[in-house]
Each structure stands twice: as C-alpha cells, then as structure tokens.
C-alpha cells in the first residue's frame, strides 16, 4: 500500500474544471469492488461517487471530503466509526450505524449514507453506511497508483493531491508576487 502522507488533501481548481464529471465516474468505479468501468457497467453494479461536481454561478467546483484537522464528523459519531488516522478522516464501516450525524455536521456536505445489503447467518438485511472520500487508499494499493482515481481521471488536472505544507508555501509565494507587483509603481519613502 502506498504510504499515506499526513496533511495530504485533494486540491480542486475551479478555473480548470470543465464540469465533465470524469472525476465522479472514476471515483464510483474505483469503489465498485475491483472492477473496471466496463465490467462495473456490464454487471449493472450500483456506481456511487464519493465526490460531486457542484456548479454555482457558472463555476464548476469538484467537492469532496476536506480531511479536516478537527473534523466535526469525528466528534459527532456516537460509535467512533468516523475517526482521524494517518492524516485523514476515515470511516470504519463495520462500526457505522447509519445515524447520519456525520452527514448533518459536515460543513462541506461531503458525507452520504448509502443502503447496503448485509447477509449474516442466512438473513438478508439492509443497513445504512456512511461513505466519503477515502483518498482511494485501497484502490491505490491494488493498482499501484500514487494519486486517487479522481486525480488520475481529470483531463485538465483541475484536481490534484497536494501536501498541505507545500500548498501553504505556494500560496504564500503567489500572494507575495501579487503584493510585489502591485507595489512596483508605488514609490513611498519612509
């Protein structure tokens, strides 16, 4: 399994998003149980993305779990199914009771509860299980990829997996360039 680096996030640039939904399809297929897209469709498997392209005021923005440092879902979960580990928010599905508290407190609307059929001791029941972006940890381990499926599928590279510290440095440098550029024409002496 590729090592999970602490403070890794999915960065989405709305200026490059075409709203093609390739990231959603790739996510759904990556979580279809080891199938590729053709197999998943041919087997009529339910495909559920853990991300969503949201269009607001003519701008498309890929949205998914932000892997919050102080994630409200981890505090709201009564069973501890939502937890912080390895620099990300994880859901231990076996402990999830489908109460939807995590859905209600997520500030990004990044968690959904899906009904799953469970067969135990010959009995078939449905139960709700919380689902969210898991940075494709299992998919990356099985495919040898270093980036999540949504990142791999984006034709414009609007979605990238970035180290938060590197992002902060790049943001700081970009803002410094903007400030320096705006001050070039100002000649103020102190």
Curated annotation (Swiss-Prot):
UniProt domain 4Fe-4S ferredoxin-type: residue ranges: 8-36, 87-116, 133-164
GO biological process: aerobic respiration, using carbon monoxide as electron donor; anaerobic electron transport chain
Entry keyword set: 4Fe-4S, Electron transport, Iron, Iron-sulfur, Metal-binding, Repeat, Transport
Residues annotated for [4Fe-4S] cluster 2 binding in this entry: 27, 133, 136, 150
Residue numbers binding [4Fe-4S] cluster 3: 65, 68, 73, 106
Molecular function per GO: 4 iron, 4 sulfur cluster binding; electron transfer activity; metal ion binding
Positions bound to [4Fe-4S] cluster 1: 17, 20, 23, 154
Residue numbers binding [4Fe-4S] cluster 4: 77, 96, 99, 102
Function in brief: The carbon monoxide dehydrogenase (CODH) oxidizes carbon monoxide coupled, via CooF, to the reduction of a hydrogen cation by a hydrogenase (probably CooH). CooF is required in stoichiometric amounts in vitro for anchoring CODH to the membrane as well as for conveying the electrons to the hydrogenase.
Protein name: Iron-sulfur protein
Organism: Rhodospirillum rubrum
Gene: cooF
């Amino acid at each position: 399994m590729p090592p999970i680096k602490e403070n890794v996030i999915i960065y989405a640039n709305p200026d490059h998003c075409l709203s093609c939904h390739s990231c959603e399809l790739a996510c759904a297929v990556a979580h279809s149980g080891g199938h590729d897209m053709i197999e998943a469709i041919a087997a009529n498997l339910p495909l559920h993305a853990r991300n969503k392209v949201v269009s607001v005021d003519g701008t498309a923005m890929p949205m998914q779990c932000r892997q919050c440092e102080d994630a409200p879902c981890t505090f709201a979960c009564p069973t501890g199914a939502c937890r912080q580990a390895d620099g990300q928010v994880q859901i231990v599905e076996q402990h999830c009771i489908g109460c939807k508290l995590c859905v209600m407190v997520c500030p990004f609307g990044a968690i959904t509860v899906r009904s799953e059929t469970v067969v135990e001791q010959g009995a078939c029941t449905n139960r709700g299980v919380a689902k969210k972006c898991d940075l494709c940890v299992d998919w990356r381990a099985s495919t040898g990829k270093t980036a999540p499926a949504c990142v791999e599928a984006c034709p414009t590279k609007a979605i990238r997996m970035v180290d938060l510290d590197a992002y902060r440095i790049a943001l700081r440098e970009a803002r410094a360039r903007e400030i320096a550029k705006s001050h070039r024409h100002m000649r103020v002496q102190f």
